[in-house]
Every structure is written in C-alpha cells, then in structure tokens.
C-alpha cells in the first residue's frame, strides 16, 4: 500500500496547498482515494470528492471526504462554491483582471481519472485561479482548449510517481498509524487467485486495491 499512497503524497505536495485551500478530488479510484487519505492526514479541507461509481463514493466517504457527489447529478464545483464562500478579503483566493473580487477560498483540483476529455472538463468547470494537479495517467492522445485555462489563469501541474524521500515518509506515516489505508484494501487474495482478481479490476464497483497474500 505504500506505493499508491506515495503517489498521492507527491501529488498533494505538487499542489502546495495552503491553510485556506479547498481541495476537489475528481475520480475516486485508487489514486484519488489515496489523495483523500493524504489530505485528511494533513488536516486540509473540507475535501470534496466526485465519482460516478456508488462504491467508490462510499469509499471516499469512509476515508473522510467531507462532501461526496455524483458528478452526473451534482457539480463538485457548485459544492466548492457552497463551502468556500468567505466574507473576509484576507481569505480570498488569487484575483485577476477578469475575476477581481471572487469571495471564495482558493481551490486545488486533483484530476485522478486519466482518460481523454477529463482535463478539458476540469478546465471548463474549475473555479478561476485554481491549481489543477493532473495525477491521472492518460495513456491516449488528449485535447483541451487552452483558452479556458488562460482566461481563468489556471495553474496546470502534472504529477508522476514520487521521490525516494516521499516514499520513505509515506511508509513512516503508515507505520505510525497516521495515514489511513485500510478502506483502500477491498480484497485479499492468494497467488492462485491473482488472474481472476486482475480481471475484476476493470469493474469500478468491485475493488479499489487488491492485496496479494502469498501462501
């Protein structure tokens, strides 16, 4: 479990979240769920999570996500506006010429889906001046319109793997019980069940992470 959580730790580090930032996690597969776990460990929130899978939404809630939505029914960005609104100008996020008086805390969006079209959806939906951390690994050609990012002055950051130090830190957090990982483990199988377990990973309702226990 150290490896996916280290990936998440690196993504959160790349997000450089401040005390007032409100994170939005798009996609609650293994990496998105791990990002939620790291955010909760660090006391960052409220955490908004979005996924179309009921099973994954349930896992996100179990890991501590404060608001969990089905994006087909409720926009996570609408949820952000509800919880990020503030009256103190000192807590406002970054302002721009086009968006000079947005009375909201800053937003950091974690794209943890990794399929074509999602970056464009995030750029179109994310609040102005968001930081978008792309942690989902899209293996196909993708396209998005830079105009959305330019007009909103969105910071687009890509994240991959982790450093040696981050891996060691993640392992230490797990050993100390500071990082919640148990809900991520949805199945435990022996070596003779690995093939069937791998086939089942294509079903988002079945498993998040499968732990292989050698006999």
Task: Give names to the regions the model predicted.
Residues 97-98, 120-123, 164-215:
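C-terminal hydrophobic helical "lid"/dimerization subdomain
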Residues 113-176, 213-215:
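Glycine-rich phosphate-binding loop and adjacent beta-alpha segment
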Residues 25-28, 40-117:
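Adenosine-nucleotide cofactor-binding segment
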């Amino acid at each position: 479990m150290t490896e996916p959580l280290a990936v998440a730790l690196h993504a959160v580090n790349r997000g450089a979240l401040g005390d007032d930032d409100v994170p939005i996690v798009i996609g609650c597969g293994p990496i998105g769920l791990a990002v939620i776990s790291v955010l909760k460990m660090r006391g960052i929130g409220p955490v908004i999570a979005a996924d179309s899978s009921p099973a994954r939404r349930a896992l996100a809630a179990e890991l501590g996500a404060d608001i969990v939505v089905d994006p087909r029914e409720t926009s996570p960005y609408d949820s952000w506006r509800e919880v990020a609104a503030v009256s103190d100008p000192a807590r406002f996020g970054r302002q721009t010429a086009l968006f000079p008086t947005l009375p909201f805390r800053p937003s950091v969006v974690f794209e943890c889906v990794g399929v074509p079209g999602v970056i464009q959806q995030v750029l179109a939906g994310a609040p102005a001046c968001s930081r978008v951390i792309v942690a989902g690994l899209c293996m196909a050609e993708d396209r998005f319109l830079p105009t959305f990012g330019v007009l909103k002055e969105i910071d687009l950051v890509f994240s991959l793997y982790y450093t040696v130090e981050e891996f060691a830190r993640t392992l230490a957090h797990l050993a100390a019980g500071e990082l919640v990982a148990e809900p991520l483990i949805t199945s435990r199988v022996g070596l003779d069940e690995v093939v069937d377990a791998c086939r089942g990973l294509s079903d988002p309702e079945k498993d998040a992470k499968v732990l292989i226990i050698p006999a």
